[in-house]
Amino acid sequence: MEKYILSIDQGTTSSRAILFNQKGEIAGVAQREFKQYFPQSGWVEHDANEIWTSVLAVMTEVINENDVRADQIAGIGITNQRETTVVWDKHTGRPIYHAIVWQSRQTQSICSELKQQGYEQTFRDKTGLLLDPYFAGTKVKWILDNVEGAREKAENGDLLFGTIDTWLVWKLSGKAAHITDYSNASRTLMFNIHDLEWDDELLELLTVPKNMLPEVKPSSEVYGKTIDYHFYGQEVPIAGVAGDQQAALFGQACFERGDVKNTYGTGGFMLMNTGDKAVKSESGLLTTIAYGIDGKVNYALEGSIFVSGSAIQWLRDGLRMINSAPQSESYATRVDSTEGVYVVPAFVGLGTPYWDSEARGAIFGLSRGTEKEHFIRATIESLCYQTRDVMEAMSKDSGIDVQSLRVDGGAVKNNFIMQFQADIVNTSVERPEIQETTALGAAFLAGLAVGFWESKDDIAKNWKLEEKFDPKMDEGEREKLYRGWKKAVEATQVFKTE
């Protein structure tokens, strides 16, 4: 009887369940979207119960649609949108407020106040993160400060906090397991990534009671079992957890120090495995935990690109220059270059290494001869220039020259982007056969814990290359193009509307 690992990929707009066999191949997929709530400008929220319902639905669907029995599931892995915060009543199981999503800016004033009080470096040193509304800690504080009676309940031990992984494990296990893993804990602003413990000083600054917090566990371990009424009478081990970007790093088999993956999603996320050393960044990168396994943790440097694949969506939906995302490739290849045109897609500011929230998108180098093809090519080249910005920051901070770049996300299907990426970073770009690397990473972590796979070496054999793109551009051309990009970014940062 063939066995499978069931991977739950709980994302920002949808929940997915994917079955993987022992070769790491996909045996079934189910997906369900859920509602986004925008109560005020800049606020983004989810209903945690709707997320839970969507997860139950896709788990049921993927099993039923693929004629798999529940007793064929060897283990469950969970990967999740990171930082999104749920606070719930531990007796009723009901959230006391919507889940506050990672994108939400409603805690900006809390961050600003802590910065004014001089605590930014304290948080940076202990957590590797910036004092930003992006991370979970200020979201918990906001809920406790703004929901009537919440703080009193929390202090009495009646409330629990969790990121989405914690919420799902608690529900799946029938309220038995209140846990998170090292990778998710490292995104909360409350976890000391050096001591590997919740930090009392940070909790005091955020006024968050410690009794709300989940137990922090390795990313690959049996945390509990599904309660039988959720899983066709079966008690299936819940055995692997990692935040989405860390799961993608693991799914790309980036197990060695210096291994790098880049995800081209709506935004872009690059992670470098820095081994057992937490590298302090001088270049605006985040220092974070990659995963905890085999009794130790691996650290990572992370760079964020705010606009990646969404630049192609903008060409399609905003400017209506293309009818579909794949069409961007055919337009881009109709011309030999952009003829000096640069698009800086700073629609919501610039991420790593600039961290300029006030910058806005700009276009440079237009002439009477500029055509649609040049504009489209310049827009999709911007994904690759931004990736080089982050990669150079990583090499500078870590002292490691990147030997190859493993890639995933929607834009990797575009061969033009992949080749231009290899050219502009002067490094081989490796596109895997299975591009569902986030879900695969969670499956690998769960599979290791239940003996479905024996070791990381066993897993590495399952990673298969679909295509390798080697750099073909000469050095002079590469540096000339990149100098132009740096000038364009500089000009973008100078131009600020009032």
Swiss-Prot record:
Gene name for this UniProt entry: glpK
Annotated coiled-coil segments of the chain: none
Residues bearing PTM Phosphohistidine: H230
Annotated metabolic or biological route of this protein: Polyol metabolism; glycerol degradation via glycerol kinase pathway; sn-glycerol 3-phosphate from glycerol: step 1/1
Homology family: Belongs to the FGGY kinase family.
Molecular-function annotations in GO: ATP binding; glycerol kinase activity
Record protein name field: Glycerol kinase
Residue sites binding sn-glycerol 3-phosphate per the record: T12, R82, E83, Y134, D244
Alphabetical keyword list: ATP-binding, Glycerol metabolism, Kinase, Nucleotide-binding, Phosphoprotein, Transferase
GO biological process terms held by the UniProt record: glycerol catabolic process; glycerol metabolic process; glycerol-3-phosphate metabolic process
PTM summary: The phosphoenolpyruvate-dependent sugar phosphotransferase system (PTS), including enzyme I, and histidine-containing protein (HPr) are required for the phosphorylation, which leads to the activation of the enzyme.
